[in-house]
């Protein structure tokens, strides 16, 4: 497993940040894989995968660059500059474009775990990578960025509340597969066998993205990032027809999402419903004993009760 040595001061000073480039790169990974992990990703791929594949078919060098950079166990570092927070996409993409060609080639050899194909022995790899990321941003992420950002901001609110309630260990253990707090100032960041890194004294940031993706990145020894999938997704699992008929589509959607604790802000972002509508649904579900609420720091989190779980499961199984 790969792990970082993190002292108490570094962990206490860590923060959550949003990154349009990280969101875009997560989208690139999803387009490259072409396999959805939930209905929202399936609909998104149906809209955008044909255009993405057509673009790469017309640019075989960039297509090879993507295949080489997204390694089975490692991503070429120059593709994922460590987020700094509060940077627009254009500034982050400029950092990809500014990578030194020799560094880009070296990073690709690491992600390939072998020699570089002859077609990639060239100096325009950073520009090609930045151009592709700009395409993914413009065509697939930017039009939906405001909604995505609301989901990401809601995730940060919930995670911050969890830190206040249960400490960093509880947050890190649930962040993403392969990440957990090992104790003795050790943070496991993935399941791969890489040498440990001492990061005490560096800046540590945690970066949510809406696709089911995650990775780590760093800049020298000054800044480290853990990118993880946000709890909100682009679209929830559709409610069973019977549940929608019983509760109404909007209320059923809220109940489905509350399989895990969520704040009102997260529900608004994930459902696209207004704050007033979500609030009314929650009041009815609370009165009916289908959901419960508890305070986590400054936030109030809602989740299904056992009765709510029974109702959802019964509706999903259908008659009989």
Predicted regions: what is each one?
Residues 157-246:
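C-terminal regulatory or interaction extensions
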Residues 14, 19, 37, 68, ...:
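Generic serine detector
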Residues 205-320:
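Extended mid-to-C-terminal alpha-helical interaction segments
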């Amino acid at each position: 497993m790969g792990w970082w040595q993190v002292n108490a001061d570094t962990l206490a000073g860590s923060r959550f940040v949003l990154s349009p480039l990280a969101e875009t790169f997560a989208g690139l990974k999803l387009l490259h894989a072409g396999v959805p992990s939930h209905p929202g990703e399936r609909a998104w791929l149906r809209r955008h995968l044909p255009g993405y594949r057509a673009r790469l078919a017309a640019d075989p060098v960039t297509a090879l660059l993507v295949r080489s950079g997204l390694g089975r166990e490692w991503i070429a570092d120059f593709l994922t500059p460590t987020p700094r927070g509060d940077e627009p996409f254009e500034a982050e993409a400029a950092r990809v474009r500014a990578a030194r060609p020799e560094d880009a080639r070296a990073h690709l050899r690491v992600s390939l775990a072998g020699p570089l194909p002859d077609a990639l022995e060239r100096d325009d790899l950073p520009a090609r990578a930045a151009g592709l990321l700009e395409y993914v941003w413009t065509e697939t992420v930017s039009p939906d960025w405001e909604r995505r950002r609301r989901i990401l901001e809601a995730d940060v609110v919930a995670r911050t509340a969890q830190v206040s309630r249960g400490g960093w260990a509880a947050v890190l253990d649930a962040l993403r597969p392969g990440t957990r707090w090992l104790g003795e100032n050790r943070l496991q960041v993935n399941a791969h066998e890489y040498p440990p890194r001492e990061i005490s004294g560096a800046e540590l940031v945690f970066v949510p993205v809406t696709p089911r993706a995650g990775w780590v990145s760093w800049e020298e020894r000054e800044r480290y990032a853990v990118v993880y999938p946000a709890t909100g997704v682009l679209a929830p699992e559709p409610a069973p027809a019977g549940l929608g008929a019983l509760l109404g589509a909007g209320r059923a959607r809220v109940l489905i999402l509350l399989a895990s604790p969520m704040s009102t802000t997260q529900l608004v972002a994930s459902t696209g419903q207004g704050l007033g509508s979500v609030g009314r649904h929650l009041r009815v579900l609370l009165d009916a004993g289908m959901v419960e609420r508890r305070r986590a720091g400054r936030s109030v989190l809602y989740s299904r009760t056992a009765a709510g779980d029974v109702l959802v499961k019964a509706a999903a199984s259908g008659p009989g």
